[in-house]
Amino acid sequence: MNTPPLICLAGPTAAGKSAATLALAERWPLEIINVDSATIYRGMDIGTAKPSAAEQAQVAQHLLDIRDPSQAYSAADFRTDTLALIEDIQARGRIPLLAGGTMLYYKALREGLDDLPQADPVLRAELEARAANEGWPALHAELARHDPITAARLSPNDSQRIQRALEVCLLSGRAMSALLTGTRRPAPSDLRFVTISLEPSDRAGLHARIAQRFDAMLQAGLEAEVRSLKQRTDLHPGLPSVRCVGYRQMWAYLDGEVSFDEAREQGIAATRQLAKRQLTWLRAQPERVIVDCLAAGTAARVVDIAARYLPG
């Protein structure tokens, strides 16, 4: 019996992926692999629009709450975890469904990754200690000496990427920009992918949804959620978790850098920019089935398309 292709349900923020996912789960014995770099974090539920407890009870969900906000999770980690999950889910006679909007994760899974050295905890701690004393701009200047191409595209305060680029240089003896031209390892050849892409027919309609969604998060307690994170001494604005859209704006508000209204407007604007980047990536993918996420019956349309590829 042939294994059905992997359905990838992709789309920008506020496109309605969650509702479509649940509709699919009512029809097939699915398990969801979340393709989302924010919902991996524990204690970050409201601002990430994480599936509710009731939704998680309806269908098995993977790659939720797998990291503390102080911890890193890379595209390479996602690829490793997802390939193992796909094998396990299929071995149990169930169907994996990839759903989410972190396009780098889709790219890593399908196209593979470059052979970069793994992070070294000792070296990472040394770099963080130096940054605490010298500041990230000083480490950015050091990176510019090792790898001017990578340094030129990074902000002097982009701590995560500066740290990683310096790690690569110091561990491998080569510039990250040079290593990124190396050979990639694509997904196993027996995996086939079908992308169902939820895309808006009208940009203004998506923007309205984004504003409504962000306001709903504020009403649900996003400020309190960020305040709780901010009370931790091991979290700071340079971490990927805190830089998530919505969180960094509320963090700035709680730091007194902006007013509440400014944080709201900046959060909505940042979400729109995220959606724009997501759509730009999707539109560059030639093989995708497009569903208008603003039309009535979007979830039913997704089910109809999936039925072309899934058994039963």
From Swiss-Prot:
Substrate binds at T13, A14, A15, G16, K17, S18. Gene3D superfamilies: 1.10.20.140, P-loop containing nucleotide triphosphate hydrolases (3.40.50.300). Its EC number is 2.5.1.75. Residues 36-39, 160-164, 243-248 are annotated as: Interaction with substrate tRNA. Its cofactor is Mg(2+). Pfam families: IPPT. One of its GO terms (biological process) is tRNA modification. InterPro entries: Dimethylallyltransferase, IPT, P-loop_NTPase. The record marks T102, R124 as: Interaction with substrate tRNA. It is an enzyme of class 2 (transferase). Keywords: ATP-binding, Magnesium, Nucleotide-binding, Transferase, tRNA processing. Catalyzes the transfer of a dimethylallyl group onto the adenine at position 37 in tRNAs that read codons beginning with uridine, leading to the formation of N6-(dimethylallyl)adenosine (i(6)A). Belongs to the IPP transferase family. This is tRNA dimethylallyltransferase. It comes from Bordetella avium (strain 197N).
